[in-house]
Amino acid sequence: CFGGPKTAATLDEFVAEATGGLRALPSPPFMHGAGHWIAMRTWLSGGTVIVQSQPDRLDADDIWGTVEREKANFLLIVGDAFARPLLDGLKSSARDLSGLLSILSGGAALSAHLKEEFLSHMPWVMMVDGLGSSEAGGQLSQVSAGGSASTGTFPWSPQNHILAEDLSSELEAGHDGLGWLAKSGRLALGYLGDEEKTKRTYPVVNGVRYVVPGDRARLRADNVIEVHGRDSVTITSGGEKIFAEEVEAAVKAHTSVYDCVVAGRPSERWGNEVVAVVRLVDGASPDDQSLLDEAARHIARYKLPKKIVYVPEILRSPSGKADYRWAKQIAAEA
């Protein structure tokens, strides 16, 4: 009545209404921020959260089978660590995935060439990169279409800012060098019982309160934000800061590289040197120079690995996060 929506009169009608709208499959564990954020957002919007049959491990056939069977229209993954096996699963089986409308990657970088590969299988799907943190929540997002996929660049939005190195001011578009990626607006109160850490992470600059999770970035003159990586995993080599994620993306651009983690190790000449820990695609056997030549197409030569270590498996957390302590140990022992 009063022009409102029709109320379900039968159980079948109620079930049909309840299963409409957002049907999300968050494939990472719910202990991961991206996993439980998407689950809560879906529930709070009246959608359905779908869980694969084997949530204790990444099983590509299980995930794609669940997407097909449950008609999921939204899939959450965590960067290349999830994308690679899922793409392998797409190649090995034919499924009806026409109901899938969007794939969101959050928590780790998703390489441009892997986005393109997803789109070659499912050209109708919207590929979305999301960047956020426990401290800031969701912060940046980027949508890719076939032929124009990129990694690490995001459109600017009013709540996102780049702060100066010393956190004294906000930088204008087209600034020199790198600053700190920051966010304003509705923010957490801080860390419980840790006032000092709260002051560092939630600084007040010229009367505005920001959150600074630790990512280094640049705001280009065209209002595009370039994210270079976490300051905590940078490698200072020859006096220059090198971002591990940037080198990883460059090495993974080689078609024979299945996965890669980059770490530093002591060097008499450079202070520290970059080491790439690489897992190759099964059956591939490129030489080091081939990998370096491809990486040099994407980053400056001084950032190239001084050593490449090949391993059968890259150690990552259940949520796909790189284990940089493990990588540093592998680099030191090589």
Regions found by a protein language model. Name each.
Residues E68, L101-G130, S134-I225, R230-T234, ...:
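Conserved AMP-binding/adenylate-forming
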Residues T48, N73, L101, V125, ...:
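Short acidic/polar active-site loop segments enriched in Thr and Asp
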Residues G65-E68, L75, R84, G132, ...:
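AMP-binding/adenylate-forming catalytic core of the ANL superfamily
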Residues C1-P26, M31-F74:
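Conserved AMP-binding/adenylation subdomain of ANL enzymes
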Residues S102-S105, V262, V309-Y310:
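Hydrophobic/anchoring residues in structured secondary elements
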Residues R23-L25, L181-A182, V277:
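Short, well-ordered beta-strand segments
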Residues A18, L22-L25, I50, P55, ...:
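Conserved helix-loop-beta element of the AMP-binding
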